[in-house]
Amino acid sequence: MKKHYLLTIMALVLAIMPAWGAMYMVGNAPFGDWNPGNGVEMTDQGNGTYTFTTSISGTVWFVFADGQSSDWNIFNANYRYGPSSGGSQEVTVGNTYSTSKSNNNHSYKFTGTGKDYIFTFNLSSLTFSIAEYQEPQLPNPFDLPAGDVNGDGEINIADITMLVDIMLGGFANYDTRHRSDVNHDKEINITDVTVLVDYLLGGTLPQRVKEGYDYVWDDEAIPEVHLSVSLDEWNRLLSLYDANAYTTQYVMATATFVKDGETTVIDSVGLRLKGNTSRRRPEGGHGQMHQRDNTDWHHAHFGVNLRKYVDDDAHTIQGVRKIHLKWFKDDPAYVREVFCYELFKRAGVWTALRDNYCRLWIHVEGDSREAYYGVYELMEPIDKRYLKDRKDRFGASDGYLWKCRNAAAGLNNPGGDIWYDDDSDDRHTYTLETQTDEFDNARAQLIDFMNKLSNLSDSEFYTWIQEVTDVDLLLRTYAVNVAVGMWDDYWNNANNYYIYFNGKETSGYQFFFIPYDYDNTLGTSLRCGVQDDAGRHNPLQWGNDNNRLIARILKFSDFKAKYVLYLKELVEARNALMDRRSAQARIRAWQERIAPYIDNDTGEDTVIEDKPASWGNHSEYNLLETGSDNFFNAKAASINALP
């Protein structure tokens, strides 16, 4: 006959060492014997009841539970919590966590003082211990090959079974679908099953062939980019910056792209500086020309136009004509923007640009060696080539593309600063980037769009917005935007986005919203617009409703319901999108890949750190811990609180 136990755990078994903020925890203490070194007093109450009291803290907690000695199931337990006397911290019984299948050894997880702990007791030796909980990490999703459909590290009949289930309508998240495309044709069908069966019978799995844009932005590689500049051209770049920090002028260079043992060398390319508030001089101080000895290199953003001076097929990298090179300014984690653009892709937002890691070197003519600038973002520019690459999705690639910025692009100011890209250094609120010879027509179309956005009645707006845009795609885009904590955006700050009209009339076109510039996210927060906490702010009240596009759409209950649904899908664990554990698995994988390459000749940003930008207003946010200050936990809480 099984014994019944009533365990009374008195437990705030922590003390904080002020100097280091370290946590002291109870070690092993035997039932029936007090070990003063642990700071815990045990009292035998009789009838199998034991009381443990910490002398480390004056706060005493009780957790009562009834159950079988062989299977103490915390979910079925009769438990309650609360301090015996004093105290203000709460300890919550959480999920069961078993460290042993032995009937005598049991482990349970609880939360206290913002951290998770494991309480373990052994019925045979009558001992217990408490230790900080170490959560099992999910496997690196990028290491699992196509064909390992269920992600268990093996390819066998179970993967075929799961693949067939997916084909019949079974659930599959992004990673599962990716691994289900065994033959890499971007479809999941009977051919993939055939390939898997052939493999299990002794065949081989096909290798993914990456060409064109997929070759340059290959998430399985970290390519090298080498830029070689003559001394005169480098000094001219420095002088251009001194004359106007926002210069868009190019100097001539040679670019070398190295990936998977293949080297592509392109001469006579255009090199320029990029960035907004992050613009920097790449060397020295104002007025200083290149110093050959003891060079003072600085991280900076660069744009490379491979066809700036010579317009032929030889001046591309497998058809790619431009690349942007962005340093990880204000992102000690080296991951925020890469994470966001990959999340857009996972969530089905195909308008997001491509982004990946690369390593950058710069050589100035006459220097004894290249300067290693470290790990950079390799970004796809949003331009006419971006449109052509997605022509089938956009429907047409010869429409009007606008860059919107300056914290004034609310799509509510038809009399605002509207101009075209004239190769000057001017920075307009709305800049036409394509078909600039049709500026008057493009401007008239944009103004008409603004007027309708602001002035149509609610019923007219409801019909019109569904005619001119894919509302579902727009809501998915904005769900990701808000989920990652993008406060410097259209809705809140009238900033940082592109729009595209695929037709040239004032009707009969499709309008597309293109997300852009996601480095100040994932816990890098700022008091801006209507908000001051990018993690906990209400997603339904994210921005200024005078920036009407999103605000007007969400006035309608069906659109609002979709938006909330897409937000909740992002944080639901099984979808492997932005729940904490799957997000952390991807972040750790990226950081492990780039860690050997972080140290660089600028001496800047040489350590990967789990913290937001130093100038933010919520320094408590982190990405890789598990408590309430973890950004993913905070964001999930704010989303799941929505009705």
Where do the language-model regions lie?
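Internal "kinase-insert"/substrate-recognition segments embedded within catalytic cores
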Residues: 297, 301-313, 318-334, 347-353, ...
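Conserved NTP-binding catalytic cores of kinases and kinase-like/nucleotidyltransferase enzymes
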Residues: 209-339
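Bacterial N-terminal signal peptides that target proteins for export
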Residues: 1-9
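Structured interaction patches on ligand/partner-binding surfaces of diverse proteins
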Residues: 71-123
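Middle-to-C-terminal accessory/interaction subdomains
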Residues: 214, 220-222, 233, 281, ...
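Cellulosome-associated attachment modules in secreted, modular CAZymes
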Residues: 137-209
